[in-house]
């Protein structure tokens, strides 16, 4: 078992290239990517460059060409990471690349046939295979969750309302997590695969020109594996050992991330919602690239994890307590050269990220120990009931449960009656102590009741007794019958409680998976084991070849550095070869520099286009604000606005008391209550105004709303001369101290053109209200209604 604390390790990066698709073949596209699987090298030719220019070469931990199988990718890339997660490490596998390069195929694949299953379903099967092969001394608890990030909103794909926006939280113990995220305990492969398919149906997908089933969101499927020694095994350890030496809960968390692909609008042909989704996807992937660059740079003291929901959730996976594997997916066609090079460059940089993984022992959110303790407690209760079940039982009083001792009644009755009652109790208790069936116990109770009744009747019939004694005997007979019924009820209740305890223990134990049992039970088990052995041997051989290749490269470099030459000609030849290699590298770097400049220019143009779109939306919102809210009230509103960096949202103080919110509640209340007293409601809301005109008409503007513009609280419309004077005065004097920031509403008013000499525009402003209303973002309208 590896130590709980280890040193740093770099992110493992593998590259997978898909084959040319049917459309690319029909268009006559050529393949520009060559892959050396044994050397772990990818070479990309520039289709626009001269034939003499050498291809760009990149070396990674592992590469997979278009002939590789899904199982090969899983065995070589994912299996070692899953083994570490079962030992208690955190792990992350995420697919990165351009849209349409096969990321979802790599991560999810197809359920049938089995050869096309991706990393996620193969991980399910492998996790439960490992648990099945365990010796049986450990207990496992496996949980799963599934979420997506759509348009920078975190959604629970397994929740009842999968479109509900979830909240991100952060704590020192758990790190960044999603509040109230649904989790399901899974006991086998089939259950976990059902969870995957249920969430997959709720995920956002859409068609573009590059991919008919394009993922429009980032998804994260999380498997949490808890492991602990069984209670019996922990109790059987040596007496000299400490109690908790071998009874730690180890929790490994595996994140399987399927990122949405980066895309260019001119290639995808995205419009409308697809275009908005593409902008959000590109922004989050840009934030991911910035985080990778900052981590590799090492000089930056600030890592911009908070720039995106994606980077916040992957914070531990990039530079934190996680073992991470990045699968970079690329396309082989010449028209994807720019995107392929961009993906390979990011992947090449990600190799230098250093993580510091460690085993997670006894975390506070572990559920397995809670399950164990609850099962132990329930078993102790059941054992106590079984051990004391034959003891005397108290008659229930006030509906309470029976206790394990007799409460004697003090009554002035004949000693013979007490003797009969004691005899009946003794017979019932003797029967309960012996392990007999329910039918036999009922029969014994009936016999005891009959005998007691017979003896008591004989006492009543005895003529030698006084009338008072006979009455006491009759009362005792009646009480004895009630007591017998109470005993029977107590016994039945005890049986029901025992059944409930047994059912609860069985349910709790059913959630815990114990090794030592073959859960698959397949006929071809031996054949499968043989294939696994062959596959493991092939993996070891591949790893040995990779290590040997790297060793030879290092030895060759060392020989060149320490070479001693027998003659001057030999030295000239060696130096010439070295110079030729260096010149080729120089030419390659020179060409790469030109490519980087082109890529930077494209990214800059894309960001400028996004900036223009956002600016257009901001100007529209500013126009709406300027049309409907007087300048002074804009200043007042902005004074009560606060930016929440954690949630990336604006909050306004006392927004529930705003006129629109009150009016909405009033309308809803009026709809629910048809007999609503309008007069009383108007009296209650006499100081609540639903528009600035009502407010100023009531004369409240001069008392409460005196803004920086003076006068009656900014009563003038923003398009009028008075409104412009107020606005200009507010811009000259008001607002916040210091430089202008994004919360300065004066800058928003500046973006609206209120030209004095343009009468047509001023005349068109009132007419544009309906048009502006229709172009408001639906989410804004929904939030307003809320």
Curated annotation (Swiss-Prot):
InterPro entries: Kinesin-like_fam, Kinesin_motor_CS, Kinesin_motor_dom, Kinesin_motor_dom_sf, P-loop_NTPase. Residues 367-687 form a coiled coil. Interacts with D1BLIC, DHC1B and DAW1. This is Kinesin-like protein FLA10. Residues 702-716 have a biased composition (Gly residues). Residues 700-786 are annotated as: Disordered. SMART domains: KISc (SM00129). Residues 688-786 are annotated as: Globular. Its main location: cytoplasm. Probably involved in flagellar assembly and maintenance. May play a role in flagellar synthesis. GO terms for molecular function: ATP binding; microtubule binding; microtubule motor activity. It is found in: Cytoplasm, Cytoskeleton. One of its GO terms (cellular component) is microtubule. GO terms for biological process: intraciliary anterograde transport; motile cilium assembly. CDD domains: KISc_KIF3. Residues 771-780 have a biased composition (Basic and acidic residues). Keywords: ATP-binding, Coiled coil, Cytoplasm, Cytoskeleton, Microtubule, Motor protein, Nucleotide-binding.
């Amino acid at each position: 078992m590896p130590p709980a604390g280890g040193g740093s390790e770099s992110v493992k990066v593998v590259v997978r290239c898909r084959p040319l698709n049917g459309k690319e073949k029909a268009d006559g596209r050529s393949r520009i990517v060559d892959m050396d699987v044994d050397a772990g090298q990818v070479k990309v030719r520039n289709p626009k460059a001269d034939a003499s220019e050498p291809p760009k070469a990149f070396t990674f931990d592992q590469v997979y060409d278009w002939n590789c199988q899904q199982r090969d990718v899983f065995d070589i890339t994912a299996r070692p990471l899953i083994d570490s997660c079962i030992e208690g490490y955190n792990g992350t596998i995420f697919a990165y690349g351009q849209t349409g390069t096969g990321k979802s195929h790599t991560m999810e694949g197809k359920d049938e046939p089995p050869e096309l299953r991706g990393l996620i379903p193969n991980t399910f099967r492998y996790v439960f295979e490992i648990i099945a092969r365990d010796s049986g001394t450990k207990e496992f608890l496996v949980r799963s969750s599934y979420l997506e990030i759509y348009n920078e909103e975190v959604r629970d794909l397994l929740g009842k309302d999968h479109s509900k926006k979830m909240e991100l939280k952060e704590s020192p113990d758990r790190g960044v997590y999603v509040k109230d995220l649904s989790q399901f305990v899974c006991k086998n492969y089939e259950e976990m695969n059902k969870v995957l398919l249920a969430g997959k149906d709720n995920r956002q997908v859409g068609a573009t020109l590059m991919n008919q089933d394009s993922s429009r969101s980032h998804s994260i499927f999380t498997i949490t594996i808890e492991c602990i020694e069984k209670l019996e095994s922990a109790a059987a350890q040596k007496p000299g050992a400490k109690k908790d030496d071998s009874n730690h809960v180890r929790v490994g968390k595996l994140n399987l991330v399927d990122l949405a692909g980066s895309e260019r609008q001119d290639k995808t042909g995205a419009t409308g919602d697809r275009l908005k989704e593409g902008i959000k996807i590109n922004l989050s992937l840009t934030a991911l690239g910035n985080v990778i660059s900052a981590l590799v740079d090492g000089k930056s003291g600030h890592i911009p994890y908070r720039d995106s929901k994606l980077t916040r959730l992957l914070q531990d996976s990039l530079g934190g307590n996680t073992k991470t594997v990045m699968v970079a997916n690329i396309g082989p066609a010449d028209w994807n050269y720019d995107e392929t090079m961009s993906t390979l460059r990011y992947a090449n940089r990600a190799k230098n990220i250093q993580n510091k993984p460690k085993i997670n022992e006894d975390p506070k959110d572990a559920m397995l120990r809670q399950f164990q303790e609850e099962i132990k407690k329930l078993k102790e209760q059941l054992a106590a009931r079984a051990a004391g079940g034959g003891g005397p039982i108290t008659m229930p009083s006030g509906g309470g449960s029976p206790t394990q001792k007799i409460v004697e009644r003090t009554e002035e009755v004949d000693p013979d009656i007490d003797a009969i009652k004691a005899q009946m109790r003794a017979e019932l208790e003797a029967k309960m102590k012996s392990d007999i069936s329910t039918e036999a116990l009922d029969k014994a109770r009936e016999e005891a009741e009959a005998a007691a009744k017979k003896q008591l009747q004989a006492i009543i019939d005895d003529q030698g007794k006084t009338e008072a004694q006979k009455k006491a005997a009759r009362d005792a007979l009646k009480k004895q019958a009630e007591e017998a019924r109470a005993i029977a009820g107590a016994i039945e209740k005890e049986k029901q409680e025992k059944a409930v305890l047994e059912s609860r223990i069985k349910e709790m134990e059913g959630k815990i998976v114990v090794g030592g049992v073959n859960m698959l039970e397949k006929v071809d088990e031996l054949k499968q084991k043989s294939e696994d052995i062959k596959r493991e041997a092939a993996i070891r051989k591949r790893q040995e070849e990779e290590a040997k290749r790297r060793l030879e490269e290092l030895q060759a470099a060392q020989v060149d550095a320490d070479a001693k030459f027998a003659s001057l000609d030999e030295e000239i030849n060696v130096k010439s070869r070295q110079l030729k290699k260096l010149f080729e590298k120089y030419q390659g770097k020179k060409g790469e520099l030109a490519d980087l400049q082109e890529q930077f220019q494209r990214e800059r143009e894309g960001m400028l286009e996004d900036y223009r779109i956002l600016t257009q939306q901001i100007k529209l919102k500013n126009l709406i604000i300027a049309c409907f809210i007087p300048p002074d009230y804009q200043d007042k509103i902005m004074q009560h606005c606060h930016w929440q960096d954690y949630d990336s949202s604006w909050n306004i103080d006392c927004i529930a008391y705003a006129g629109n919110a009150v009016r909405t509640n009033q309308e809803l209340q009026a709809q629910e209550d048809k007999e609503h007293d309008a007069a009383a409601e108007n009296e209650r809301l006499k100081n609540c105004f639903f528009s600035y005109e009502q407010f100023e008409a009531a004369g409240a503007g001069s008392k409460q709303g005196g803004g920086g513009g003076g006068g009656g609280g900014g009563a003038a419309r923003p398009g009028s001369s008075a409104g412009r004077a107020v606005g200009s005065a507010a811009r000259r004097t008001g607002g916040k101290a210091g430089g202008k920031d994004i919360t300065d509403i004066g800058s928003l008013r500046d973006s609206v053109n209120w030209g004095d000499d343009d009468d047509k525009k001023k005349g068109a402003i009132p007419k544009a209200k309906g048009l502006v209303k229709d172009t408001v973002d639906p989410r804004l309208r929904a939030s307003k209604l809320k």
